[in-house]
A protein has these predicted regions:
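Cleavable N-terminal export/targeting peptides
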Residues: 1-23
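Short loop/turn motifs that connect adjacent beta-strands in outer-membrane beta-barrel proteins
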Residues: 20-24, 49-60, 95-101, 141
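Transmembrane beta-barrel strands of outer-membrane/channel proteins
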Residues: 28-32, 64-70, 103-109, 146-150
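Extracellular loop and loop/strand-boundary signature of outer-membrane beta-barrel proteins
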Residues: 29-30, 74-76, 117-120, 153-157
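Residue-level signature of outer-membrane beta-barrel architecture
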Residues: 32, 46-48, 92-94, 136-138, ...
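Short sequence motifs at beta-strands and strand-loop junctions characteristic
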Residues: 34-36, 80-83, 124-127, 160-162
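Outer-membrane beta-barrel "beta-signal"
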Residues: 41-44, 162-174
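Membrane-embedded beta-strands of outer-membrane beta-barrel proteins
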Residues: 42-44, 88-90, 132-134, 168
């Protein structure tokens, strides 16, 4: 398991070099699951470079998000899991100043290394990812916030316990 974790960390760190050429931002997140386990996520985002409903209140925009999450297991690490996810995310930014509060929401897909995460049985490795977050955009290069993410297979296969992750995140534009 340590070799797998080392490989995942090395891959995530090398993602930064690749992503700097093509991605608009790199995101790191640390969170806890609904089962009290820890999660660690690294992701890359590509801004849509479009906005809708622009007004003095703010604007609607969005980005594509791809990420890798390490789901910490028991103390022996034998129950640790990994997941890859991809989602379109809509963002509403309030205001036009240096600090812009925002809310975000998205629904995407994910694939897990196992159907069990802690005590939760997801029923299948393929799951949907629903997210809701809020935070502050700092200038044009940084975002910090909190995010709740729910994973389940939408009843495609039973059991479908689902699992949630609640995380603090930081994003930096490249």
């Amino acid at each position: 398991m340590n070799k797998l974790l080392s490989f995942a960390v090395a891959a995530a760190l090398s993602l930064g070099g690749v992503a700097s050429v093509q991605a608009a931002e790199i995101t790191g997140a640390v969170g806890a699951t609904s089962q009290s386990g820890m999660t660690y996520r690294i992701g890359a985002g590509w801004n849509w470079d479009k906005s809708w409903w622009e007004s003095s209140t703010g604007r609607l925009t969005g980005y594509w998000d791809a990420g890798y999450t390490y789901w910490e297991g028991e103390s022996d690490h034998s129950s640790a899991q990994h997941s890859l996810s991809f989602a379109p995310v809509f963002v509403y930014e309030f205001g036009h100043g240096y600090l812009k509060p925002f809310v975000e929401a998205g629904i995407g897909v994910s694939v897990f290394s196992s159907t069990k995460v802690g005590e939760q049985d997801l029923g299948s490795a393929f799951n949907f990812e629903d997210r809701l977050g809020l935070g502050v955009k700092i200038g044009e290069t940084q975002r910090v916030g909190i995010r709740a993410t729910h994973y389940s297979n939408a009843g495609i296969k039973q059991p479908n316990d689902g699992i949630e992750s609640y995380a603090l995140f930081y994003s930096h534009s490249l």
